Structures are given as structure tokens and as C-alpha cells.
Amino acid sequence: MKREYQDGGGSGGGGDEMGSSRDKMMVSSSEAGEGEEVDELLAALGYKVRASDMADVAQKLEQLEMAMGMGGPAPDDGFATHLATDTVHYNPTDLSSWVESMLSELNAPPPPLPPAPPQLNASTSSTVTGGGGYFDLPPSVDSSSSTYALRPIISPPVAPADLSADSVRDPKRMRTGGSSTSSSSSSSSSLGGGAARSSVVEAAPPVAAAAAAPALPVVVVDTQEAGIRLVHALLACAEAVQQENLSAAEALVKQIPLLAASQGGAMRKVAAYFGEALARRVFRFRPQPDSSLLDAAFADLLHAHFYESCPYLKFAHFTANQAILEAFAGCRRVHVVDFGIKQGMQWPALLQALALRPGGPPSFRLTGVGPPQPDETDALQQVGWKLAQFAHTIRVDFQYRGLVAATLADLEPFMLQPEGEEDPNEEPEVIAVNSVFEMHRLLAQPGALEKVLGTVRAVRPRIVTVVEQEANHNSGSFLDRFTESLHYYSTMFDSLEGGSSGGPSEVSSGGAAPAAAAGTDQVMSEVYLGRQICNVVACEGTERTERHETLGQWRNRLGNAGFETVHLGSNAYKQASTLLALFAGGDGYKVEEKEGCLTLGWHTRPLIATSAWRLAAP
């Protein structure tokens, strides 16, 4: 619909002045100029621009933009205020007249030209051909723009000459059709609707381009400084969460991804997982527990990849098995209760060691405890079948029983006793209880750990092996817990990065397949650890199950429950050190003996700890 234009001319007050101003914004349909060719695209937007005026309008728009400060170093706030209050602009639909009136209001001289370089000529031009006419605009200096993808082509230096106004005009962004031509090369492309677009760019050498272009702000990103700011942002956000200052926490959590993008390697990944966990806590989008068959299968898959990618689980299994093997010395009937059997990866090595024992292997019974499956299948029984087949091949008398329990606190002593009546003439079973990364989950429910330790004490095991993360992620203070977990998982991710270069076994096998498999293992291991981070940071109450504690804290808990430490022998220490030589980055992994327990860490930071326990003397 065309708008009517009336020249009020006067400066009346009150409602008359407002009506006059509104009238000045109207345009008469008779002014369109019947018979004149008007650009259809601009006309559809409500602007009248004759095809013959396109180049002139473009140049005036550019001058207006520079005058308003958009292309210069800083905008003119006074001019913007002036435009918003006192100025009356006539007929904005007549784009040419409107731009001219805006320029006349400003009445600013053209921008000064920078001095010409002594021996270089920067002749730059760009032409975009469209359906409505030709625009002669300066080229875009920002050739890295993903929106416009303008790629300047370097031309050889020529004889010195004065710079034209076009060559030094502030750069403008320009959309091209993906084609570029120069004095030495040309190409063309066709876009939708049959409209062909082409661009011609003749760029000066870098020195000349720098001299010709106006000074633009340059942002130099200091990776180390950005890393410090990233850590400060993470800690400040955690402090805001603890103080329940959600507005500050929300503002900080939005900065974390931007700061993390400047980092590389382990720091970027750790920051991404902690940033996600903070965002979930701030916006109350807590992670849901694994409740479907797919979730359970995915958790098992992550556990398997973590086992393959780094030595932590292998170290846990090896040191626990060594303690159990020494406790079973000379016994003919042995029984192992595994509080978290998973895929049963720990037990083939122990079965093989027992099979090679002088005097022959003992009768081996295994009780595997695991959570119920969402589809109610007996996954524990499938693990038992595989272990039974392996035991048969190495000629070990093997019995297996699976116990499904939603939590270890549901176990009762009678469930762990031998089935049926024991033969009084036979040697009694020697029991070992094994827990790898399971005890800390009991701390989510008050009294659950004490209940389980009471059950263990009732079956009177000869040895109890416990492997836990060497960290304190169970503090009552959220900020303390967050800070400790940030340090812990940063070291854990560093160890994954350090061990990703390929160990001796991978190098000897050669080929791209082992490297690809190692890369997959590392990525899935990072997801495995990321889920722990999310639980530590984003969850509370019974949902927060990753309540890791230090070896000293476990020593107090087990000591109060009636257990005492069994010193792990020097043989376990030596063999564990030998095991680490098989892994890439083995020089970074450190095994330490601490008060009869063994810890595995990365450089100077212990990450997991293995301890062995027995019933204390009455």
C-alpha cells in the first residue's frame, strides 16, 4: 500500500506537530514516476530506488555508514541522539532523497585519506553483478568471514601511484556467489533463479593492504591468560551456586564455553564437562539415572572402553587379584564375592593364576552381584556362562551364582553362604570380598555402608579388597567439592591425553586400525568420566552417587567397622610397575606404596587406591 506525503512545513505544537511529523513520513503514489524502472526487490520492501540511481544510492549509504561511526573507530553518540530527537526526515521510502537528507543533517566532511605507501599501489575494487543493477563497493578486508567467504588474491607490486578514494574507503562486507576472478584467474557460478553473480578482487600485497586499510582493532588471545580466566570463571560460578546467587551463576555459566573455546587438549574438554554440569545445576536440568536397556548397555560400553584406554581398571583388578591370590594360598575351596561384577573382566586372570598354582587349582566359586536389567534379562547369568567356559578350558572346577540387587544394602549374610548343607569332612570355604569403585555409592544413603560392612563381617571373609578413587568428592561444601573434583578430573584427563600417543603394543602392531581404536577408546573414556563429573556437580541427595573419598577416610570408616589393614606385598608393587610399562605415557604413571596400600597416579597426583582388609582381632 502506498503512503501519502504531505509537506507540513510548519512547526506547530502539541498534536498538530505530531500529526505533521507523521505526514512527513508519508509518500504519494504519484511520486513513483509512472514509466520509470524501479528495483523490484527494494520496492517489495517499501523503498523506491530507480535502477539508474542504484550506484549513487550505494555510495551514499556507504558514506552515511562511515559518518555515523559504523565503519570508523567509534560511533558518534551525539549524532545518534540528535537523529533520535530533533531531526525530521522526509519521505524515507524515497531511499536516495532520504540518505541525502541524512548526510545533510550530519554535514560531515569525508574521512581523511591515509598516506600512500612509497612504492606500492593498492588498487582494490569489487563488482557484484545482480539482477537489478551493479554495485561498485569496496572489497571486504575480512576474508576469513564464513558468511561471505571473500578470498583476496595477492597481486604483484606495481609502480607507485596515488591511492584513489575507493581504494582506501572503509571496508564493507559483501556477499559473493562463491566465485572469484582476478587479473590472472577467473571463474563463475550460477545460483538459484538463473541470476549469475561474480566478484572481481585485486588485493594488494599484505604490506600495502595494511597501509591502505584504516586501523582496525586487533584482538590477541593469550591462551595462558584465557586459561586462567576460564578457571576463575568456573570457580566463581561454583561460588555463586553455593551462595544461591543464580543470576550471577547464569551469567558466568554462559561465559565458560566462550573461554573454553580458546583452550586445547585436556583443559578444553574438562571445562566443557564442568560447564555442562554447572549449567544443569543452574537451570535445574538434572541428568536422569540409567533406566532403559539402551542406557545400561551404553554404561557397560563406556566401562569397557575405559578399561582398554588407560591402566586404572587394570591396575585395580591386578592388585586386588594379587591380594586375593596370596590370601588363597594353600586353600582347596575358595569363594569370591564380587560386589560389582560388570562384564567379569577381572576374573579370567585370577582363574589362570590359580590354574598354574603348584599342587593344582582349587575349587573356585564366584558370586557376582549386579543391578537389575531394565528388560529383566539375566545379564549376570550370561557373564557366568562365559567365565564357566573359560574355566573349563583351563581345567578349573568352577561354580557361579548371580545375585541381582538394586543396591548392596539389600544383601543379607545368608545370600552369600554356600548353597545347601556343607560336608563336615570337607575343608570349609575361604571367602574373599571384592569391591572395585562400588563402596562410595553407598554413602548416598545414610546407614547403607554400615549395613553392608556388617553383612561382610557376618560371612567372616579372609580378605576384603577395596579399590576407590583417591579424591574427596563428598564434602558438604559445594565449592570445596567442586574445586577438588576440578583438580582431580583435570589430572585424569591429562593422563588420557598423555597416554593417547600409542604404547609399545600399539606401535608394534602398526597400521591405522590400532590408532583409530585407541582414539575411540579415549573419546569414550572421556564420556565415561564426564558422566561422573555431571553427577558430582549437578546432582544432590540420593541422586549424587559419585561420593568419592580419600584413602584416609576409608581407613577410618573400615577401622570403625571392625576391620584392619592387610599390607599389600612388595611383589604386587613390582608387578604393578611392570604392568604400567605396557601403556603409552608409562613414565607419567606413578605407583606408590602408602601405609600398606598401593596408589596409582599421574605424575605427582594419586588417582586411585587399592587397599586390603581383614577382620580385626577381638
From Swiss-Prot:
Tissue expr: Apparently restricted to regions where growth is occurring in the leaf blade. Localizes almost exclusively to the basal elongation zone (EZ) for the elongating blades of L1, L2 and L3. More detailed fractionation of the L3 blade shows that in cv. Himalaya, it is preferentially localized to the basal third of the EZ, but its presence can still be detected toward the end of the EZ (at protein level).
Q: Where is the composition biased (Low complexity)?
A: 119-128, 176-197
For this chain's UniProt record, which GO biological process terms are given?
Answer: gibberellic acid mediated signaling pathway
Annotated region Leucine repeat II (LRII): the residues are 382-421
Where does the record place the GRAS domain? 221-614
Tell me the segments the record calls region PFYRE: 431-535
**Entry keyword set:** Gibberellin signaling pathway, Nucleus, Phosphoprotein, Repressor, Transcription, Transcription regulation, Ubl conjugation
Q: What is the name attached to this protein's record?
A: DELLA protein SLN1
Which species is listed as the source?
Answer: Hordeum vulgare
